[in-house]
Regions:
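Inter-helical turn/loop segments and adjacent helix faces that build the functional surface
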Residues: 120-124, 184-192, 343-350, 401-408, ...
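Replace the tail clause
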Residues: 1-339, 343-346, 486-601
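Extended, hydrophobic alpha-helical segments in both membrane/secreted and soluble proteins
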Residues: 153, 174-177, 181, 340, ...
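Long, polar/charge-rich, low-hydrophobicity segments
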Residues: 206-209, 368-392, 399-561
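Glycine-rich, acidic and aromatic/proline-enriched surface loops and short helix-turn segments
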Residues: 139-146, 358-366
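Conserved helix-loop functional segments at active or binding sites
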Residues: 314, 318, 342, 346, ...
Length: 601
């Protein structure tokens, strides 16, 4: 609004009554490389305030007037498939067919764009959409943006081929990337994608998980004041750690050369190695728990390259430690809860669902005060009034836990938080959710954000929450808010729908035929059979496009009928189970075996 460009971190100078008159991005402490420093900026601003105070106050008034005027330029539109198709074309136009990703350097993973492409490809029978997502996922894994020694992805690549990253690792990136790789695995069955997801999750469990179950924000790029020092190696270091022959083989596998690929050192990568898929599917030797897809850890199963990774992992820890940002944020933790829950369901790994359950318990215990969400927790202190992203993402996380566990308490809590979100943040006149609550801190304007940038916007996530609650409960209260929200999003994305790819996921959910599957399960069913059936249904709920799954049993019948009134029409059988499937407006006769419906699902 002030300079025509943006960036991070944000620097704002304000009047004493909190009206901005100057903005910028990063300023070093002192001037360098021709760039003014913060000390010089503040000194100059103080001088201007003394001699030109009225001019600065007038400037602040003009900025305030402009910001307030933007609220009245909002327009609404009807959700339609034209925007969905346009978003695909926009992404296709800037797709890098050689290296994957979109546009030129720097390249960001933008996992929600990839999830959109996979969903679009499945619904529209457009294999080229899936191919774009797959190419990107493969090349990102092969590149240096993925940590081949310790797992996890860095924030972005400074080049076009994903080789040299900005080495900072963030929780939200890795959460969304797990979701993208799990989506790819569910769509294709290609084992590699499941392995990458597991390696990200093992990194998060090992490096970013608090002893009480919450997830930390991330790790810095620098160690000893040097960016990337922790992650790069010389050829001599590799040989010293692994021995001459093993070191030589490892260097050949992972592109470690004498001249290096980053300031004289080498970032391990598989960009020149055609055996990347086979290497990806091998288990690690980093003490990881491992999983069904990658067969457990190297402590129990061999794997020469990964034993070498274990030794290099320990070597670099001993060589230089990274600073860890150990704040625990509700919104970012919620994304990792979603990722863990989805991975657990699709990979058949209960340990990942357990990670999600523990993180939820942490939020419930430490980040709720007087019935409202806080923003962050650190060292025993919870602070900050929850914003839209906190309520929307946490509601979605609880709905994801319901989707994979079918525990009614998750659904109940999701609905309760979504009610607060709607009451405190929703603009009932024009649609859209404000960033700040109506009873929270009041700034000069109440803003709304819709652009799905590094993370999906709170407005896009809120739309998905409303949609899922509507599909599960059938409550028309959610429908009214959802309809207004989608009209608001449709207006906001006009002309640039590809910048709202997560919002488009909900739009597709609404515009394409939906599927509902109700399973009624007798109490006499064998316990192990019930467990396996629930796992199968959870997998379907995550992987099948447009499918909502509900399980009703004698144990949860009363609560289900209160939260989901239409389940009163689905009696629990005396023995076995019955499955009721509706596709669009067509409902089929109940069948006693899920296998009878698999093709339609």
């Amino acid at each position: 609004a002030m300079t025509g460009q943006g960036g991070w971190p944000l620097t704002i100078l304000m009047t004493p009554d909190c009206r901005p008159f100057f903005s910028g991005t990063y300023f070093p402490p002192r001037a360098r490389y021709g760039r003014p420093g913060l000390e010089e900026l503040l000194t100059a601003a103080a001088g201007q305030w003394k001699v030109k105070k009225e001019k600065l106050l007038d400037q602040a008034g003009q900025i305030e007037k402009y910001l307030k005027s933007q609220e009245w330029t909002e327009r609404q539109a009807e959700p339609e498939l034209g925007a969905v198709h346009q978003a695909f074309r926009q992404l296709a136009d800037c797709f890098d067919s050689k290296n994957g990703g979109f546009g030129s350097a720097p390249k960001f993973p933008a996992p929600h764009n990839l999830i959109f492409l996979m969903e679009y490809g499945a619904r529209e029978k457009r294999p080229e959409a899936l191919a774009m997502a797959e190419k990107t996922l493969v090349q990102m894994y092969r590149g240096g943006i993925f940590d081949h020694i310790g797992g996890g992805f860095s924030r972005y690549s400074t080049d076009g081929q994903w080789l040299v990253p900005h080495f900072e690792k963030m929780l939200y990136d890795n959460s969304l990337l797990v979701m993208a790789y799990i989506k790819a695995y569910g769509s294709t069955g290609r084992k590699m994608y499941g392995c990458v997801a597991e390696k990200i999750l093992e990194y998060v469990r090992r490096e970013l998980t608090d002893s009480q179950g919450g997830f930390y924000c991330g790790q810095d790029a620098d160690s000893d004041g040097v960016e990337g020092k922790y992650y790069v190696f010389t050829r001599e270091e590799i040989r010293e750690v692994l021995g001459e022959k093993a070191g030589r083989d490892f260097c050949r596998q992972y592109g470690i050369t004498g001249h290096g690929n980053f300031e004289g050192r080498s970032i391990p990568n598989l960009l020149e190695n055609d055996n990347y898929e086979e290497i990806c599917e091998e288990p690690w030797g980093n003490g990881d728990h491992g999983g069904n897809i990658c067969h457990g850890s190297c402590d129990t199963i061999g794997g020469r390259e990964n034993e070498e990774c274990r030794r290099l992992y320990q070597y670099r820890i001993d060589r230089a430690r990274l600073h860890k940002d150990d704040k625990i944020l509700v919104s970012w933790n919620s994304w990792m809860i979603c990722a863990c829950a989805m991975a657990g369901a699709v990979l058949g790994e209960e340990q990942y669902v357990d990670m999600a359950v523990r993180a939820d318990a942490f939020i419930k215990s430490h980040l709720v005060k007087e019935g409202r969400l806080m923003v962050r927790y650190r060292d025993g202190d919870a602070a900050g009034e929850g914003k839209l992203d906190d309520y929307a993402c946490y509601s979605l996380a609880l709905l994801e836990l319901y989707r994979v566990t079918f525990r009614v308490d998750y659904l109940k809590r999701a609905a309760a938080w979504a009610e607060i979100m709607t009451e405190q943040f929703f603009d009932r006149e024009r649609g859209g959710f404000y960033l700040y609550a109506k009873d929270g801190e009041q700034l000069i304007v109440r803003t709304k954000e819709t652009y799905d940038g590094a993370m999906p916007s709170g407005n896009s996530v809120a739309a998905q929450v409303l949609y899922r609650l509507l599909r599960i409960t059938g409550d028309v209260t959610w429908q009214k808010v959802l309809e207004k929200q989608l009209c608001y999003l449709a207006g906001a994305m006009d002309g640039y729908p590809s910048g709202h790819s997560y919002g488009l996921l909900t739009m597709m959910d609404v515009l394409y035929p939906a599927k509902e599957l109700v399973c009624t399960l007798s109490s006499g069913s064998d316990t192990e059979r019930r467990r396996k059936l629930a796992a199968q249904l959870a997998n379907l709920a995550v992987t099948a496009e447009g499918l909502t799954v509900v399980i009703k049993t004698e144990e949860n019948a009363r609560e289900m009928e209160r939260l989901i009134p239409y389940t009163k029409d689905y009696p629990v059988p005396d023995t076995g189970e019955l499955f009721y499937l509706c596709v669009g407006h067509e409902c089929m006769q109940p069948v006693p075996q899920l296998e009878q419906l698999i093709e339609k699902l």
